[in-house]
Each structure stands twice: as C-alpha cells, then as structure tokens.
C-alpha cells in the first residue's frame, strides 16, 4: 500500500502540470474561435465587396444602355438643355360618330357630334414628365347645370425610339344630330338639334416604334424636350388596343326619323375590343431657324371582337371582323431651347363594320401652348456661362 504522505507529495508535484494542460487546451479553443471569427469577417467583407462590385457594374451597364437607347445624331437633333419646364395650354376636344345600316342603295346614315369642348391648363414638367391641372372654360361662366360632364384623361410619352399613348374618354349628353342621309325625305330642318340619346366610353393604348430615331425626333414636335435642327423623316410601326362602349337610344330621335329608321339601327348597346397593327411615316420639316413642323400618318389593320345588345355577334367568316383604323398627328413649334410656343393636333379614327351595321367614330385634340425651360442640366451649365 502506498503511504498517504507519498500520494499527497505526488499530487502536489503534478498539480502545476494539470493547470498547464488545462490552460493550453483553453488557449487552443480561444485561438480556434478567433480564427473562425476572423475567417467569417473576411468572408463577409469579401462578399460585401463582391456585391458592391456587382451593383456598380450593373449601374454602369444600365446607364450605358439608357445612353445608347436615347442616342441621337447631334447634327440633326439637339437634346434638352434644362431639367424643369413651365407651360400654359389651351386645348379643344372634338368627337364625331356616324351610324349606318350598310344596306346598299337603301343605306341610312346618322351623324352626331357635340359642341367643341375647350379647356385651359397649367403644367409643370421635369425632363419628359409633365403634370398639370386643366379646367373647362364653360365652368367659369356657369355652363349648363343639366349637362353630364365629359371625362378625358391621357398620358403621352414621346422618347427618341418609341412613343406610348394612354387615353380614357367618356362623353357627356350634349350631342347634336348634325346630318341625316338616306331617308325618303329631306330632314335639313332637323340638323343641329340637341340629342341626348348617345353616350360612349373609349379607353386604350397605342405604342409605336421609330426606326430613324437618331435623326428624327418626335419629342421635338410634341413634347418640346429636344430641338430638330435639320429636316428628317422616319418609318414607324405600332400596335394599339382599345375598348369601345356605345349606348344609343333611338326612341329619342324625332318621330319622323324614327318612323323610317332601319331595324339594324335600333340597337341599344355596342361593345367591341379593337386590336390593331399599324405601319406609317412621319416627317419633321425645319423650315426656319428654331422652327419645325410635323406630319405623321399611322394607318392600321384592326381585328374587332364585338357584342351587340348583350349578345356575342358571331359571323361565319372572321375576315369580316377586319377593319381599318387611323392615327393622324400634325404639329408646328418654335423652340429656341429656352422658350417655346406651338400647336399640335392628334386625331384617332376607328371603323366598325358588320353586314348590316357600321359605326365610325373619331376623336381628336387641338393644343395651343407656350412655356419656358429653366434650371440647366449639369452637363450643359458650362456651355451656357
């Protein structure tokens, strides 16, 4: 048996070595932990650097794409030199409807249109975005309290390569019967009488591509965001989609007209959707310094899916659902980069035809405006000093 005194003596001798071993193990764990944390930190920093690099690269690529997308030939087009714009506008709205029965020599046609609507507007713009407020001139003088107000909303985007038109129109009840044709007697005495039996709603979108965008500028003629320096033209291709709802109460026609009215014109509601592909041409004519005039025509072939009086209108041949649409634009502008004044007209025409019924509706806007640009862009400030 080992004496207790010897055992105690051995434990005292081994105690420092036990402490050293424990401290060594603890130091090893601490070292491993610090190494792990260091690796994690380095990994996070490296990942952050990679993300920042990707973001910078993506940002540069996007800026390059935008720059290339809006590239222009500066011999033909001068870019907008300012950030902000202020504009006053006078606009006149027009619409027209022709209803016909397509019965050969017995064809009947009724033409309706309201009085021209006039509005005044104030606009504030940042680059190519314009926001403003318009009001009806008749409202300033009281107007007709019983008249249902029209609703017109539109958004036009004119860039160097493409353009987009978004619009919504809802007519009031102030139509007039402008002409009556194809009846057995002359109804000249009924021309221009008030007719509140016609209402319509139209909403849609037009999108078009400009092929010669480096030399031909739509914004120069319609949004004053560039200046056309030399005459140039371009072919254009476009697509449009629109929905049309027409309500017609023939019972509100004069009795003498209603008595002879064809059965195909005694409908109550027409609803149709129009899908159209178009191809046309536009030309900017620079006829004097800082002056440009534009004329563009974009005819289209449209397919129309219709519903009459809540019944789907089906025909044996789909080719009979193919009709023609037309978009016309014209403008004249004076723009010296700082101040501008001009006028423009945009006219939409839609043609709907079935074996016994036709509806041709058109609407357009005449704008007369004046304004000025301010706050020069950073890249052009030195050239203006």
Spans of model-derived segments:
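Residues that define the transmembrane beta-barrel architecture of outer-membrane proteins
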Residues: 82, 114-120, 147-151, 158, ...
């Amino acid at each position: 048996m080992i004496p207790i005194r010897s055992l105690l003596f051995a434990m005292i001798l081994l105690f420092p070595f036990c402490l050293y071993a424990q401290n060594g193990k603890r130091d090893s764990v601490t070292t491993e932990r610090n190494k792990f944390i260091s690796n994690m930190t380095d990994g996070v920093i490296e990942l952050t650097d990679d993300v920042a690099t990707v973001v910078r690269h993506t940002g540069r690529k996007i800026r390059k794409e935008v720059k290339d997308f809006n590239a222009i030939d500066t011999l033909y087009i001068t870019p907008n030199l300012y950030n902000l714009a202020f504009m006053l506008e006078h606009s006149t709205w027009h619409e027209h409807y022709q209803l016909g029965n397509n019965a050969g020599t017995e064809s009947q046609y009724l033409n309706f249109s309201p009085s021209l609507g006039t509005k005044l507007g104030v606009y504030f713009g940042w680059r190519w975005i314009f926001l403003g407020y318009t009001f009806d001139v008749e409202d300033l003088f009281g107007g007709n309290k019983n008249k249902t107000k029209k609703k017109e909303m539109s958004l036009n985007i004119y860039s160097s390569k493409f353009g987009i038109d978004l619009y919504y129109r809802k007519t009031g009840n102030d139509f007039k019967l402008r002409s009556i044709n194809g009846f057995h007697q002359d109804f000249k005495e009924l021309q221009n009488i008030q007719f509140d039996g016609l209402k319509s709603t139209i909403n849609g979108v037009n999108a078009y591509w400009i092929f010669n965008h480096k030399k031909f500028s739509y914004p120069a003629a319609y949004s004053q965001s560039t200046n056309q320096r030399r005459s140039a033209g371009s072919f254009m291709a476009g697509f449009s989609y629109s929905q049309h709802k027409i309500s017609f109460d023939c019972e509100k026609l004069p009795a003498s007209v209603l008595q002879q009215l064809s059965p195909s014109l005694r409908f109550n509601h027409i609803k149709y959707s129009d899908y159209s592909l178009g191809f046309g041409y536009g030309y900017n004519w620079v006829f004097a310094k800082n002056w440009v005039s534009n004329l563009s025509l974009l005819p289209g072939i449209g397919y129309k899916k219709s519903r009459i009086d809540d019944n789907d209108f089906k025909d044996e041949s789909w080719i009979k659902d193919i009709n023609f649409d037309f978009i016309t634009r014209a403008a004249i502008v004076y723009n010296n980069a700082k101040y501008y004044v001009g006028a423009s007209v945009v006219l939409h025409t839609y043609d709907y035809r079935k074996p016994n019924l036709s509806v041709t509706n058109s609407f357009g806007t005449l704008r007369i405006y004046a304004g000025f640009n301010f706050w020069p862009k950073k890249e052009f400030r030195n050239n203006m000093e």
